């Protein structure tokens, strides 16, 4: 069976959180679907599925049967969704304006000029136009959901306004019914019209605010140009980037954005990669160098060969990761989804109960109060505020992170990150620049050409970061690669190689001890001096004899000290792990004011160290560059990988810091705390709003002070409850990290 695939599809026709639940539950039960998650704030469906068992088109058919729709089998579904969203917003704005233009005179007739001749008939006509022309979608959607055995916010609006209108219509056509009972026949046409006007206004403001929550994704997608100049048979032709294929030649001129990932095949230039890497200095590119989509060519013109197009570009992968993260669900959202699923039926039940209680307590004389209270209960209840509480905060938080070169994998990672109280830092590539260089060497005896050739060959076969430093150092010695009998890399220790039956080795002090090689006193004194300067020591020998010792320096990043201090100010305990010797570890720890450190650690030691911290009740984040860190990253509560924009280890860690700036680490933790706090605030206010609003609408205060909530005010409260949740989430966007 083919491996699982993940696809993100735009969803159409959703109006509230209940709709999102309906779509999600519809897709979840389809054969071949492993996971399905709907983000109401983004109007997207994320599905993990088996392509051999089900296709996106089959998913669409199932969703259509449930009364909704998906955008599939188009070249750019996101662009289609954006265009549909723009059209939806324009239509919503027209309906809102139209509803208010008629609702204002309707409200004046109903509340100020009540005794206007023929006033009831005029109000009935105005209300009918508002309902049929501008509020039509509420009734269409409400009926559609009823036919599918479900209910949503549209159901509540359709029910409440229809009840108010039909009651008023009856009283207009047949007022004698109430006169015969000695009662005044009241009409509430203004309630029908103004409720729709307020709900439309709320949805308009909500849509506008929701669009702001996705601005980060839009700005990322906007980095990539829409067209490119493809070169064929020496001729340039401007084509959509969707037509580019791997292997195509593309011409890039000064000042243009690079359209796809590729390698320079002719010419040279300097490229601004700051939008991906965060590095402000342009990078010189010449033949054979890699260039990335979305980066800006500055001075020269060049030809490039496309190596990554469409969804295979680094920029697209970042966008996909952020979209997936925004669509993920925090653990608390699962509870909210269950509540949203039964919310509307419960509200309808409460409205019926309210109506019955009023009639039982007050009799037929309280019929109008009973009706108004039931309508208010239907109107004031808002599943949207609950449904928007978590996803809007996640969208803004994840988007802000992406804008600041922080990629958070999902809501689970975000929630765990905010709980971290201990950070474990790997030295090489995390605290240091990751650009090591040999600064000193000590040969026990004079270096022969054979010794240099064997060392060069060993390092050529090694993938360790320090190997590149030794190779660069050997370039000036004319050392050359030779044939070796065998080669073995020993994780955490070094490499050993057989040449003509003799074992040569290069590595750490642990390797030195494994081969029981002795360090001469004069070499030992040099080693102590180098370690006190914070340098890494590499030993080179054959069998049990030491041949040479090299000191390798990897400068600390300018922001490492500031980042460590920022973490400590946040109350986070900082630990340093390194494979270097004790003196080197002590020196680096002292330079950065890190109290907890451990030297001479192997990859397995890192995992055990984190396990011991967790056993002591710590919530641990491990920060590394992905090299020799995989076990420790997997063990940590939160794994954080350092990247450089062009080489993002997105599959390695829960959090990826795209640039090499360690200050992103405290920024990421601050962002997680603020996002989670925003989620909790949103949920608190959404629940409190409904817990207080529904009893008020039912008339619980009427026996105390005669207060009865007008349905129009109830609709205004409902409209602005969801808007307030989105606005609270947007505070994240405007805050500084």
Segments from the language model and where they lie:
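Juxtamembrane coupling segments of multi-pass membrane pumps/enzymes
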Residues: 8, 179, 193-254, 285, ...
